[in-house]
């Protein structure tokens, strides 16, 4: 076998997923250089709109996570604070606002925006974040307002409200970019998006096996593609390849998790990107693997028609009632035979962290699994204590081991 053929044969899904992310940024930069209008987009803004129009957008949340993971989160956060923003403001927002102020990013080059696409189903603070960008740069902001849903289903009046904004966003983006909506293309994008979402969720579902065929932190790394390229065939193919690899790992007893899986845990919250390696290393020390999370799977948006598409964007984790949010976690724990939980009290994400103390109490009460929490931040390393985290994980391990010995 030639070296070239060997390389192709051995190429894994993770390599294709990295290439998709790199291509995403490259194409946006090239579009900007050609004089096309490009935008910054919220992670749970309906991606079907920009994809159908062929408009290039980048995702500040993805970008801020990459900057933080590469060790530059603190510098960017401090720059934003020097601009007048409080340390209490979301770390992703501070990183992104610093990039906006500087006008470029050394860590991961991105084009400056000609418009912003905002959606508040994952974060209410995002409205003010994007408003500031729009005002500072004097560019249009398109907002799709998703009402907080306290019900078990999404009512028809909510669907109509979201649909009206969806249609208006298309018209606004047509005017801004000069591109025209193609209904046939939209149908194709929806079909591909469903294929991507189903394969992504299929890959995540293999965590139910003991041992899990993958390290739970793999999902956090691969999630960027679920955000930025869900409507592309490349993403659908790569996620199918990933799911197939995990399926094969189940059959052969292999796993991307290094070492023996001794404990299975739920990880609740956004990853602390500046300390991702430290967190993973400490969990691995006790043989703990993340087998349950709702964060990564939040981008597996499933629908069969337009009404269901509107409803799907009203059912993401941060736009639903506490009881429904609890049900998501209970299902994640019970469906994967998870035995403990680690909860990230994220100083950047008030909307998410605000209910986590009660979630921890109810989760422990209704499942009987031990739960610990730690303080941290998704982008600002100053809000994370290695010593506190290490002590909490050590304590969780002791309780989990004692429970097993008592059974």
Curated annotation (Swiss-Prot):
Top-level taxonomic group: Bacteria
PANTHER family in UniProt: 2-HYDROXYGLUTARYL-COA DEHYDRATASE, D-COMPONENT-RELATED, SUBUNIT OF OXYGEN-SENSITIVE 2-HYDROXYISOCAPROYL-COA DEHYDRATASE
Signal peptide limits: none
The protein's assembly and partners: Part of the heterotrimeric phenyllactate dehydratase complex FldABC, composed of (R)-phenyllactate CoA-transferase (FldA) and a heterodimeric (R)-phenyllactyl-CoA dehydratase (FldB and FldC).
Keyword line: 4Fe-4S, Iron, Iron-sulfur, Lyase, Metal-binding
Encoding gene, per UniProt annotation: fldB
Pathway(s) served: Amino-acid degradation; L-phenylalanine degradation
Regions annotated as coiled coil: none
GO terms (BP aspect): L-phenylalanine catabolic process; L-phenylalanine metabolic process
Function: Component of the phenyllactate dehydratase complex FldABC that is involved in the fermentation of L-phenylalanine via a Stickland reaction. This complex catalyzes the reversible syn-dehydration of (R)-phenyllactate to (E)-cinnamate in two steps, a CoA-transfer from cinnamoyl-CoA to phenyllactate, catalyzed by FldA, followed by the dehydration of phenyllactyl-CoA to cinnamoyl-CoA, catalyzed by FldB and FldC. Requires the activator FldI to initiate catalysis.
EC number: 4.2.1.175
Name under which the protein is recorded: (R)-phenyllactyl-CoA dehydratase alpha subunit
UniProt cross-references to InterPro entries, sorted A to Z: FldB/FldC_alpha/beta
Family statement drawn from the similarity comment of this UniProt entry: Belongs to the FldB/FldC dehydratase alpha/beta subunit family.
Cofactor notes: Appears to contain about 1 [4Fe-4S] cluster per heterodimer FldBC.
Provenance organism: Clostridium sporogenes
Listed GO MF terms: 4 iron, 4 sulfur cluster binding; hydro-lyase activity; metal ion binding
Catalysed reactions listed for this entry: (R)-3-phenyllactoyl-CoA = (E)-cinnamoyl-CoA + H2O; (R)-3-(4-hydroxyphenyl)lactoyl-CoA = (E)-4-coumaroyl-CoA + H2O; (R)-3-(indol-3-yl)lactoyl-CoA = (E)-3-(indol-3-yl)acryloyl-CoA + H2O
Pfam families per record: HGD-D
Propeptide: 1-4
EC class (word): lyase
Cofactors: [4Fe-4S] cluster
